[in-house]
């Protein structure tokens, strides 16, 4: 494959996708640097609606709460430190932001507020993933934003670009769309170089490509092209392509709705399956293991099944829900490591539900994190 970026040409095809994250910047929702406006949000909502009608799933990561708060209380009236003022404005504006999105959709819109700490902690990460997947299953439209009211370090350049990449990996999205007020990535700053070319395809984020990124070009937003490329690198490491496009251009949205590329597509560094398996294979192990019987081992190895409690013999160590553990098979011929994966239950809980049916979990524990001890998406066979 050609590793050089290519200039835009008509009718570049965008590979089909089933699940996407759409990141919407403040420059599209508060174009004048003031309060929220539906001017560009409407076109984005129509793109989302068309995608949902086609049987696809979309999670929106939306900036704009601080910008909305400024219109409610002038910044000069906000007391305290600059950080405290921004956090207060975020609290005031978040209700306005979710209300803006709700007005465009007949289906329920769900507000999900996250911090980077939520996604660094493995157990909270799993809970966030389960919540988003359940919202999608229910047919709701999740609208994610950073929880600026309680964040400290996170209120900085480009947070929602990077948050969108993390959310894309969290829900196993096929593509990350980043909508802003620029057409995509140019080989030079188009504001100072009239002959700058818009790049349609970026096969690899090389240092030369990163050097093409300029600074922020909008009043309302906090992230420039550099942070968008950083987000694309994060998504690419998880096997997810990124598309940068101009959310102010109705034509761009129409093209994307018909799977035609408008803007810049940044290719993933590796396939999603390869990225996931690599992470599962090399993530640090917690002390402990889940011991399974021969039937469970055969189901894992031969059928690609999830690990159910009925096939579990016991658990070793003191691991917690969300920890990476080994899966062992013990028999007359000794012990064999057959897999590693993320346990949905603690070691104590695994011991209590071992040899039991999945439907009995809640009766035994008083709660239920799902019918699998390790879901097949969170498990890698060691002979793979």
Please report, for each region that a protein language model flagged, where it lies by residue.
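C-terminal catalytic "cap/lid" subdomain
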Residues: 2-384
């Amino acid at each position: 494959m050609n590793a050089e970026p290519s200039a835009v040409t008509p009718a570049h095809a965008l590979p089909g996708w089933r699940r996407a994250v759409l990141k919407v910047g403040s420059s599209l929702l508060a174009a004048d640097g003031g309060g929220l406006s539906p001017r560009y949000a409407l076109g984005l909502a129509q793109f989302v609606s068309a995608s949902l009608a086609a049987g696809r799933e979309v999670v929106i990561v939306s900036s704009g709460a601080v910008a909305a708060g400024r219109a409610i209380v002038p910044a000069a009236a906000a007391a305290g430190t600059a950080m405290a003022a921004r956090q207060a404005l975020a609290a005031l504006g978040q209700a306005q932001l979710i209300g803006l999105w709700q007005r465009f959709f007949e289906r329920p819109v769900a507000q999900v507020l996250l911090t980077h700490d939520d996604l660094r902690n493995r157990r909270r990460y799993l809970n966030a993933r389960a919540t988003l997947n359940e919202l999608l299953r229910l047919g709701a439209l999740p609208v994610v934003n950073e929880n600026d009211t309680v964040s400290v370090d996170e209120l900085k350049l480009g947070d929602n670009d990077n948050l969108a990449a993390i959310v894309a990996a969290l829900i196993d999205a096929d593509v990350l769309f980043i909508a802003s007020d620029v057409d995509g990535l140019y080989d030079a700053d188009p504001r100072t170089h009239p002959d700058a070319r818009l790049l349609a395809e970026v096969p690899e984020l090389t240092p030369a490509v990163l050097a093409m990124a300029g600074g922020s070009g909008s009043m309302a937003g906090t992230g420039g092209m550099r942070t968008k490329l950083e987000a694309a690198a994060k998504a690419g490491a998880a096997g997810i392509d990124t598309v940068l496009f101009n959310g102010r251009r109705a034509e761009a949205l129409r093209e994307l709705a018909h799977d035609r590329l408008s803007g810049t597509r940044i290719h993933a560094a590796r396939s999603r399956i390869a990225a996931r398996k690599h992470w599962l294979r090399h993530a640090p192990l917690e002390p402990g293991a889940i011991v399974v019987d021969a039937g469970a081992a055969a189901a894992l190895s031969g059928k690609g099944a999830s690990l159910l409690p009925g096939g579990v013999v016991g658990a070793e160590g003191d691991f917690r829900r969300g920890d990476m553990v080994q899966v062992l098979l013990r028999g007359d011929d000794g012990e064999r490591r057959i897999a590693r994966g993320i346990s949905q239950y603690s070691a104590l809980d695994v011991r209590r539900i071992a040899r039991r049916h999945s439907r009995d979990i809640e009766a035994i524990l008083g709660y239920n994190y799902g019918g699998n001890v390790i879901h097949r998406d969170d498990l890698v066979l060691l002979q793979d």
